[in-house]
Amino acid sequence: MPFQLASDYQPQGDQAQAIAKLTQSIASGNRHQTLLGVTGSGKTFTAANIIRNIDRPTLVMSHNKTLAAQLYSEFKQFFPDNAVEYFVSYFDYYQPEAYIPRSDTYIEKDSSINEEIERLRLSTTSSLLTRRDVIVIASVSCIYGLGSPEDYAQMLSQLYVGQQISREGLLAKLVDMLYERNDIGFTRGKFRVRGDVVEVHPANVDEDAFRIEFFGDEIDRISRFDPLTGTVAESLKKLTIFPAKQFVTPTDKLRRAQVTIREELDERIAWFESQGKLLEAQRLKMRTEYDLEMIQEMGFCSGIENYSRHLSGRPPGARPGTLLDFFPRDFLCVIDESHASVPQIGGMYEGDRSRKSVLVDYGFRLPSAMDNRPLRFPEFMERTGQILYISATPAEFEITNSVVGNKDYVPHKRDRIGVDESVPFAIAGAPRVESTQGASTVSPDTFDTNSPGMPLVVEQIIRPTGLLDPQITIRPLKTQIDDTLELCRVRIEKQERVLVTTLTKRTAEDLSDYFRDLGIKVRYLHSDIDTIERVEILRALRAGEFDVLVGINLLREGLDLPEVSLVCILDADKEGYLRSQTSLIQTAGRAARHINGEVILFADTITGSMQRLIEVTEYRRARQIAYNTEHNITPRSVRRAVQESLHLILKSGKKETSLREMTGDFDLSEVLTELEVEMQEASASMEYEKAALLRDQIMELKAGAGIDKIEPKRQPVSYKAAAKGMKFGKKLGKRG
């Protein structure tokens, strides 16, 4: 069925022209196009309309699981009658296999799988094989090895009433599909047998199970029923059962793989012995032969993914099968927050290779294990077709490639994909940077999608709310602390919130102590703050439990704080990662959801990044003001309910998935996952006190503890002397 967009809203502001232009560009066959959408302009709604217009299977990529969950929730609301799937890493905890030569330490693979995420992943692959109205929201997990779609499709079981098949034949087929027989614990991925009745709980379905009734060697009846109550919901004429795992291999390929694994093992042992590395040879022989025995007897082994090249019959060095292979060739790829996602795609391969090369060199794995890897960036680009990049700050890679006639892709000139370099679009009166293309400001009727070399970067800078980009003001460094204090007091009187960004953790902590001694309700936020505290601090800021948040890197994409009206950027002229063009634009965007939004840059000189921020802001404000005047629009602040304090709702002994509770601030499952990883790492490092503290915080999270119940990690320093006249900068100097 076609995509059916369900929404009470109509495109407003720049959305209509962006939808029309990008739909036209994709329909014309252009491979690369970019949506340059400012914060709060409704980029997700625009993407949903484009998907509806194009009507093709779509992959939406995000650079982290939290934003992926937010997108999943939004697209589920936009397309309730279509298949919207969620594909991210299903590990609650994952310790990869590794070896540290200098200490002769081998770290065995350890992991904990989230069953709900596993079900959603299986649902993704089954939807892609059976229908076209599919939208998959995925993290970078989609470029990791997943197995062959041909093998997966070959292993599924098609059943229908009247089919000639014995009960034993069906049971054998289910076992080959990695289902487990369990007549008592009937859960996902299990089947049970009662006389001539076989009941199967598919791995990709949560609420339904299926009953197959036999009459001799013929299927007499198929019905869908509730696995909890046993109530039959409906009778079926046919049924498709998908494999219980995504890594499934037909029997003939499994036998062939055992032969080729043995051949590679013999070659590698001979090489080690020729080099005098007898320990490595013996280690590899013992480990691999044990795995071969497990594969022969059980059909799988621990770490079977390391033999994926043999199981799929790929030649050495060939790319692995991934989720991308489950899509038809004409699918659309949407890369959200492309300035962060594109570099992430390019960086996954190198990190994986460096770890596995050590395992191969020291005899823990065969060289073929190197081919169980994420895609290289060129392989990703080869497998994808048409791409829509979405970002408020698209990088040089996206801008350069988004031109008519570019059927391949232009790598970054320094072979570093996605590095921020230049003005993202042409500005009237500003010098043009040669490496960029101008964004489209023409009407959809005159938008050229056919002439080679024409830019395909579409602006979306008019917000549906009529809000303007925040004003940019520059103040001197000398009085930045006193000025910030006074500005905070003014905003606090109006019951508005303030973000202050510094360059170091120490400065953030000291500044918050100084403000606290002067009566300001303030907290700091940086990477040393535990996961629960970070989430609770953001929630408490929105709820008004404090007024000022001091941090290092507050530009996190997707950080939605409508109550923030002022962003103070200290030491703005210190050019670098934290004060780059992308960072400054993203940080300034945190004040773009408030009608009184303002950004203060404290600097003695105007850097190139600052100048570009000012030019971009002036250009956008001019267009926004003109649009509001022409259409008689009065700007209004964004309104959104503050989420409750972190908690987990337990129903019938089952942890409720956080995907349904995602509202944009945080993902409960993500928080727990990060905490559990920290706890496991602390325990493995024998830091048992730290592990116990993390365990207690997890318990507080489950009990619904608020921000005030979390113990501080640092004793605040008193700056009462400063309140009596001592300058903040001098006080810092005395502390060394």
Say what each PLM segment does:
Residues P57-A69, Y86, R491-D513:
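Conserved strand-helix element at the start of the C-terminal RecA-like helicase core
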Residues F87-A98, K109-L120, S141, T502-T507, ...:
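Conserved helicase motor
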Residues A27-T34, R56-P57, D133, E496-R497:
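Pre-Walker A (Motif I) flank of P-loop NTPase domains
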Residues K407-S451:
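Intrinsic disorder/low-complexity segments
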Residues F87-V136, V140-K413, D448-L477, I481, ...:
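N-terminal cationic and glycine-rich segments that engage phosphates or anionic surfaces
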Residues S28-I50:
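Walker A/P-loop
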Residues M1-L36:
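Conserved pre-motif I regulatory segment
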Residues E150, Q154, T504-H526:
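Conserved helicase motor "Helicase C" RecA-like lobe of SF1/SF2 P-loop NTPases
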